[in-house]
Amino acid sequence: MKKPAPTQQPTNQKDGLKAWIVFLGGGLAYCMAMCARTSFGVAVPWADQRFGLSSAQLAVFIMGQLAVYAAAQIPVGLLLDRYGSRKVLTCGLIIVGLGQLALAQAHTFPTALAARALVGAGDATAFIGVVRFLPAWFSASRVPLLTQITNVGGQIGQVISAFPVVWWLHDYGWSTSFNLVALAVFMAAVATAVLVRDDPSGTKTPVAQTESVRRSMGAVLRNRATWVGWMIHATAAFPFNVIALMWGSAWMRQGMHLSDTVSATMLSLEGLFLVAAGIPAGIISGRWPRRRLQTCLAAYAISVLTWVVGLALSPSAAAALIAIIGAAIASCVGALGFDIVREYTQRSRWGVAIGTVNTGGFVSSIIAVELVGLILDLRGGARTGGDFIVAFGAMGVIIAVLVVSLLIVSRRLHPQVGIPQES
């Protein structure tokens, strides 16, 4: 008896127009979350005047936001596995908008800190919410590149914070500026609810809900791919976040005495360099998945070299440009950690697995941001160019520890494929 021909998927199920519309909605959500995330970094000089805080206290703003972000990743991953990206992304953006509204009205350190914590909690849904639905809408060969496009596309949000937000702060002041950011985030939440769908089939709950949280978490944490991905992301993300989220604007304006326009231009270039480096990284990950680890190590080495050169030339605009290039080169390979863990994790656990990996970069960023702030205070708090050289140079210790840890975790990789298999 002749076997029936396999059922063909409709062409619009994957890689079709509807898939790209959904991707656009998710990209908009991440873009506006990134704008809110980085808006405080460009506002540090204004925060100085508004709250009158030390460098270490200012760093607590970002450290607190990132701590909430990192702590929320695994719970958000569990929510994504049970309720899907559309609901979680929309709710996350609403929380981000409320945080920005609270920050606009804040006049004390504790109130502003609580507002930034709200931003961190909502922001925690954005990137992994998009990455979670990509395999449902696109073919496997396209997912690594689209993960990178999501990552670099979110940098448009950093450009928004580097230019319009700075202009608003100059022209309208603190409260109006952050109210405008909140309004933009709420508009993005509406667009996300309209455009994003979890699955081509229209299933409301895209994965099974029968597995217990304990079992799901245990399986993810026992998977060696999770920890390889975690180390990759931790090493890649923190130089970029130190510049974009906290100390980049202060370094250029106070340590180098560059103008607001030049500083904003440099910060926007960080996002553009990430685009330039991220797209090739996504192509490499998709075409040569067995070379992902080597690609990451090469990017880290190039990044360290550019930072050394940049700090040697400081203070100058060229120094800032070179350091920003180095941060972008490292950051572009962070998404390869998601590619690895997604390939070796059961689909019903993708949310919690991706969330776990995503904590890596933000744990390392918390440590690095606070380390820079503490060193600046120990050197007198004047924030001269020399102070920033010493503070940024100390981040080399973090890089060294993380790279050695990655090499140790990777020692038991499968000899043929170069990627760990799930235990």
List each model region and its residues:
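Juxtamembrane intracellular "pre-TM" segments in multi-pass secondary transporters
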Residues: 7-16, 199-230, 423
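Extracytoplasmic gate region of multi-pass secondary transporters
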Residues: 40-42, 224-278, 368-373
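Helix-breaking motifs and short loop linkers at transmembrane-helix boundaries and internal kinks
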Residues: 52, 84, 105-111, 122, ...
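Conserved MFS/SLC helix-loop-helix module at the cytosolic interface between two early adjacent transmembrane helices
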Residues: 71-110
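Helix-to-loop junctions at the C-terminal end of transmembrane segments
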Residues: 72-84, 277-290, 376
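Cytoplasmic membrane-interface "Motif A"-like loop-to-helix N-cap segments
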Residues: 82-92, 286-300
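Cytoplasmic helix-loop-helix junction between adjacent transmembrane helices
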Residues: 115-154
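Helix-loop-helix hairpin linking two adjacent transmembrane segments in secondary transporters
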Residues: 150-198
